[in-house]
Amino acid sequence: MERTFVYLKPNAVRRGLVGEIIKRFEQRGIKIVALKLLWMSKQQAEKLYEMHKGKSFYNDLIDFVTGGPIVAMIVEAPRVIEMVRHIIGDTDPLKAGTGTIRGEFALTITKNLIHASDSKENFEREYKIFFSDDEIIDYYLDVQDDI
């Protein structure tokens, strides 16, 4: 099984889309193994987005993601990184496909509702910003019989 880090940005929480987004993952057999509601600190945001430091959008992005509560989670399934990226759609909502989370609900590139790790290496770096290993719960999901 593969794992990835996902977080729902403040606008997803404020717009009441948390349940809808989680439902889309669960309907695809994706198992949530860690989940928390929190207010991202500036330090966490700067660490998460360190590769964008110095870019024109960096300060606005940091202000946005620290401006309200987020839902952070670790999810698990075979090929989950690829699957989650497909479900959420392109970073730019105008390029995100119909039926994707960003294609249906996102308004701008920065305020695109959701972040997901794009590689195993980034998952390993990103989840540790928000979770300790003892917060990850391993359990059996009935849908695993169908995988």
From Swiss-Prot:
Alphabetized SUPFAM superfamilies for the sequence: Nucleoside diphosphate kinase, NDK
Organism domain of life: Bacteria
Record GO biological process: CTP biosynthetic process; GTP biosynthetic process; UTP biosynthetic process
Subcellular location: Cytoplasm
Entry keyword ATP-binding: yes
Predominant cellular place of this UniProt entry's protein: cytoplasm
Keyword RNA-binding among record annotations: no
EC code: 2.7.4.6
Catalysed conversion reaction: a 2'-deoxyribonucleoside 5'-diphosphate + ATP = a 2'-deoxyribonucleoside 5'-triphosphate + ADP; a ribonucleoside 5'-diphosphate + ATP = a ribonucleoside 5'-triphosphate + ADP
Cofactor: Mg(2+)
A Pfam family that the UniProt record links to this protein: NDK
Active-site residue list: 115 (pros-phosphohistidine intermediate)
Chain residues that bind ATP: 9, 57, 85, 91, 102, 112
Keywords annotated in UniProt: ATP-binding, Cytoplasm, Kinase, Magnesium, Metal-binding, Nucleotide metabolism, Nucleotide-binding, Phosphoprotein, Transferase
Gene3D superfamilies: Nucleoside diphosphate kinase-like domain (3.30.70.141)
GO-annotated cellular components: cytoplasm
Function: Major role in the synthesis of nucleoside triphosphates other than ATP. The ATP gamma phosphate is transferred to the NDP beta phosphate via a ping-pong mechanism, using a phosphorylated active-site intermediate.
Subunit annotation: Homotetramer.
Similarity annotation: Belongs to the NDK family.
The name this protein goes by in its record: Nucleoside diphosphate kinase
Species for this entry: Thermosipho africanus (strain TCF52B)
